[in-house]
Amino acid sequence: MYRTAASRAKALKGILNHNFRASRYASSSAVATSSSSSSWLSGGYSSSLPSMNIPLAGVSLPPPLSDHVEPSKLKTTTLPNGLTIATEMSPNPAASIGLYVDCGSIYETPQFRGATHLLERMAFKSTLNRSHFRLVREIEAIGGNTSASASREQMGYTIDALKTYVPEMVEVLIDSVRNPAFLDWEVNEELRKVKVEIGEFATNPMGFLLEAVHSAGYSGALANPLYAPESAITGLTGEVLENFVFENYTASRMVLAASGVDHEELLKVVEPLLSDLPNVPRPAEPKSQYVGGDFRQHTGGEATHFALAFEVPGWNNEKEAIIATVLQMLMGGGGSFSAGGPGKGMHSWLYLRLLNQHQQFQSCTAFTSVFNNTGLFGIYGCTSPEFASQGIELVASEMNAVADGKVNQKHLDRAKAATKSAILMNLESRMIAAEDIGRQILTYGERKPVDQFLKTVDQLTLKDIADFTSKVITKPLTMATFGDVLNVPSYDSVSKRFR
């Protein structure tokens, strides 16, 4: 057997050598012929090869692409159980599919406290049909990427891969969301990571204060922490997560959104997997009331971190929510050192009037946190402790200046352009496009055209900005401070600085 194989190998080697010599001979003669003249180096034509400027005979050129490409239209289907499937085609070779749920920390009752945070970490773990190892291998086999995100009002699970693997993407995604196993050892492992994450939270003062303004500024559901409190960790188990999912992951509160997928093709795959979800009426959103308040945590150190925030309308008041977004861009801000490159954000209001004028500011930036029916607009700052009182007063004076109409048209035009470019550049990402589809349908019941958003931004005037800011700063103040807070003025004295 081995000799036969060897003789065949020798014969094959002889054929290959013969062909290789013929190839070398042909190549050599071609090179010799073409190199007989160097006119092609100076732009002339080769004597033996056709010019690339002359179309090949018998080859028809394809028609040129159109200068204008019609944007893809959103297609939606609502299953009998109330679940919505929405798709938007794109020319990209890859697709992004997400399952978005109207469920977040606002739906946590005391027995479920911290469940949203842990659910985010338990995404794409073992299911009733797959081990975590098998799940990872299947995702790797199609070159996919998965992610999960949790917020106060919504949960999102996404998968991204080439379009040819849409059935596999859908099956893995739905199995992970519908059939999580919540194995004890996996839950305990993620709880250990949650504890580490909570411990590291104190090293992120801005993130810590953004959580604090919610707990201090609201009473009710929006005051629930997005991050699991340490006191709740011992009560989180696989059974708790299972009950939370059973109560909240119902068909009428889910949207499956996709970017880069044919709608009919997706529908054929999704419908058998999701049509049996229970048709439970969508519950009323838990109530929250903005009240304002004061939060202080003294940890010492060489800096004072503070956040001043006010209530703004939510996304259901679309125009005013857009004004809040433009106002955030107008105020801008950043750090005393621009890590994003020279000039980044240096024409914004806070940069020009605070960071450039007062070196005691290490950072100062505007932020928004907008929900369906309410939201927050505020300014975060970090200064040296001895400058804390003056720094807070300066921030208040800048808010008053905007309310008094001190913003000029140049500032507003720059903020409007920055807002539009940020939205349009984000929507170039298929993952963000799919997320935008899912979250808008959960909020509005439809996806509003981006042109409508851009038109609203274009129509904003200086008076709109001034009137909006004037109304906002009359609401109760929410103030949160962290670090060396000994020199931070009282809540009442800061409140009085806003007219």
Swiss-Prot record:
Q: Which GO terms describe its biological process?
A: proteolysis
Q: Which SUPFAM superfamilies match?
A: LuxS/MPP-like metallohydrolase
Top-level taxon of origin: Eukaryota
- Entry-linked InterPro entries: Metalloenz_LuxS/M16 (IPR011249), MPP/UQCRC_Complex (IPR050361), Pept_M16_N (IPR011765), Pept_M16_Zn_BS (IPR001431), Peptidase_M16_C (IPR007863)
* Chief site of localization: plastid
Give the record's GO CC terms. chloroplast; chloroplast stroma; cytosol; mitochondrial inner membrane; mitochondrial intermembrane space; mitochondrial matrix; mitochondrial outer membrane; mitochondrion
Q: Where in the cell is it found?
A: Plastid, Chloroplast stroma; Mitochondrion matrix; Mitochondrion inner membrane
Q: Which parts of the chain span the membrane according to its record?
A: none
Membrane-topology descriptor:
Peripheral membrane protein
A Pfam family assignment: Peptidase_M16_C
Subunit record text: Heterodimer of alpha and beta subunits, forming the mitochondrial processing protease (MPP) in which subunit alpha is involved in substrate recognition and binding and subunit beta is the catalytic subunit. Component of the ubiquinol-cytochrome c oxidoreductase (cytochrome b-c1 complex, complex III, CIII), a multisubunit enzyme composed of 10 subunits.
PANTHER family according to UniProt:
METALLOPROTEASE (PTHR11851), MITOCHONDRIAL-PROCESSING PEPTIDASE SUBUNIT ALPHA-2, CHLOROPLASTIC_MITOCHONDRIAL-RELATED (PTHR11851:SF194)
Q: Which family does it belong to?
A: Belongs to the peptidase M16 family.
What is the protein name stated in its UniProt record?
A: Probable mitochondrial-processing peptidase subunit alpha-2, chloroplastic/mitochondrial
Q: Which gene encodes it?
A: MPPalpha2
